[in-house]
Amino acid sequence: MTEQKKVITIVIPALNEERAIVKTIHAVPKAALTEMGYDAQVLVVDNGSTDGTAELAREAGANVVLEPNRGYGRALKTGFASAQDGVIVTADADATYPLEDIPSLLAAFEDNNLDFLTTNRLAGLDDGAMTPVNMTGNRILAIATRVLFQLDMRDPESGMWMFKKNILGALELHSNSWPLSHEIKIEACYYSQCRWKEVPIRYRRRVGETKLLNAWKVGLIDLCHIAKKRLVR
């Protein structure tokens, strides 16, 4: 009897990313993941794009689901609900994250028997990949994470993580916007006591225009969100 392959789903929220979406999808190393015994599925969540993002994603071989109500966190939740049971990986649609490294991340995930793996972009920034404002904000949020939750996490804002879908039922995820990335790490690694690890990655300069128009405002909203969670959770 042929052993059934495990499933790994790469969930990619996308809003008007026609310049980068094909490059992002093609970076997923499906052949290498097949050799590791996984059926690799790319799931693009189109978050109300007004350009050709969804059509290009389908042509590039991705499954596409539509989430017309905009919000980074909302798009991710839609992707999680649509993904099959197994392992989920997240990444942005702007070609910043090293999707070619998924096999090595998966090996670390399996070898360490993890429930949740997150990544540290600050360990390998390409020139121009992150503004000084964003770097400062990330460091402030990392300090807040250590103080409030005793989690030694260098980059709590990273958008590339890997986790078992079956942990989602225990997580209280309230944000439908940018703070979801930080919130899911706190929920998994602190409140749910998942086995977790943070590993360094290379982070590239994005293709196309950023959707993050006011980094300080977004960072403040994130900080308030996690502080409130610490007080009322």
Name each model feature, range by range.
Residues 46-54:
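A conserved acidic beta->alpha catalytic loop
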